[in-house]
Regions:
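C-terminal engagement/docking regions of AAA+ P-loop ATPases
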Residues: 2-18, 255-336
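AAA+/SF3 P-loop NTPase mechanochemical coupling elements
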Residues: 112-121, 150-167, 178-188, 266
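Pre-Walker A (pre-P-loop) alpha-helix and adjacent loop at the N terminus of AAA/AAA+ ATPase modules
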Residues: 20-67, 247
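Conserved AAA+ ATPase core "coupling" helix
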Residues: 95, 99, 175-248
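Conserved AAA+/SF3 P-loop NTPase catalytic/coupling segment centered on the Walker-B
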Residues: 96, 117-144, 158, 173-183, ...
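Walker A/P-loop
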Residues: 53-90
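Conserved alpha-helical scaffold flanking the Walker A/P-loop in AAA+ ATPase domains
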Residues: 47-51, 104-124
């Protein structure tokens, strides 16, 4: 049976909280609208990236080349007013190439930090699965800790610091699959996918109208405001019934006989904070079950490790999560 909880109590924040979330919603939707002028027909993915940024999480995009991953990242960075860097990962890329190193300054007689591309707000880590494991580990440590250690000295990375990593499908030649422990550090995994006929025609029509390859993108907000919006999510109410719903989803991912590993506690924490972001985008200061369902597949599926026999049959973490979401009783909102 569906479990009921009191939506009135869930949404019972004070006026200051409601105003704060209304501001977050307005900025987030303006951001998606601005990016949507460049990225055609991918509204669900724009929302997922916005959820990821508000949740201060990192995202993994698995796609073939040419599907707009760089444009997506760069456009978001411009609209956010954030510093953007792109690193093309290759088999010979070293950790120091992305973190930076100390160089001797002959004028001052001192060693000075030559910061690498990690020192930015939005980093596109392109084809991360072409880099050797040591360099992958250096990036993933920066993602988790929001800091890097260079020659024994720890440096905080700028805030916000969000990584959009891309990887080619693992069957492609010359790739190093990310270990399960590292996959778990990505808040969201998603795919851009090919545009359909109408979307691709719209892309060409807009290119013709622009008269140039580049896109003009308005700055919607600033890094300082992004950090403030991330902090504002702490005011979004999460009812105990919603917490139980999250726990049940994650627990069931560990119980299926076809899996080796299910979702970790990090998955439940990520569902928790991302549901707050989803609620805020919709202008609510409380979470509803649909907020969980809207992001659970992208947050949980990549964390599930299937048994070999299940892989052979074509069963994936996405199949497991769809089954779980269809079976777990959903809390029903009842007006106060």
């Amino acid at each position: 049976m569906a479990q009921a909880y009191d939506a009135g109590g869930a949404g019972g924040g004070d006026n200051r909280t409601k105003d704060l979330i209304a501001t977050v919603s307005a900025i987030a939707n303006s951001l998606m609208n601005e990016v949507g002028k460049v990225i055609i027909g991918k509204q669900e993915n724009l929302r997922r990236v916005t959820v990821g940024i508000l949740s201060n999480g990192n995202m993994l995009l698995e796609d073939f080349p040419g599907l707009g991953k760089t444009m997506l990242s760069n456009t978001f960075a411009k609209a956010l007013g954030c510093k953007f860097k792109r690193v093309q990962f290759t088999p010979d890329l070293l950790p120091s190439d992305i973190m930076g190193t100390y160089m001797y300054d002959q004028k001052t007689g001192e060693f000075k930090l030559r910061a690498g591309p990690l020192f930015c707000n939005i980093l596109l880590a392109d084809e991360i699965n072409r880099a050797p494991p040591k360099t992958q580990a250096a990036l993933l440590e920066a993602m988790e800790e929001k800091q890097v250690t260079i020659e024994g000295i720890t440096h905080k990375l700028p805030a916000p610091f969000v990584v959009l990593a891309t990887q080619n499908p693992i069957e492609q030649e010359g790739t190093y699959p990310l270990p399960e422990a590292q996959m778990d550090r990505f808040l969201i995994k998603m795919s851009m996918g090919y545009p359909d006929r109408s979307e691709e025609k719209a892309i060409l029509a807009r290119r013709k109208l622009r008269g140039k390859d580049d896109h003009d993108v308005l700055q919607i907000t600033s890094p300082k405001k992004v950090v403030a919006m991330q902090k504002a999510l702490e005011t979004v109410h999460v009812d105990p019934a919603i917490l139980s719903y999250v726990v049940e989803i994650v627990q069931r991912s560990r119980e299926d006989h076809r899996i080796i590993n299910g979702c970790s506690p990090r998955a439940s924490q990520n569902l928790f904070k991302s549901s707050r972001a989803a609620a805020a985008i919709d202008g609510r200061d409380y979470v509803i079950p649909d907020d969980i369902k809207s992001i659970a597949l992208q947050i949980c599926s990549h964390r599930i490790v299937m048994k070999p026999e299940a892989k052979i049959r074509g069963i994936t973490g996405m199949h497991i999560m769809r089954k779980i979401l269809s079976e777990v009783p959903v809390p029903v909102i009842q007006p106060a």
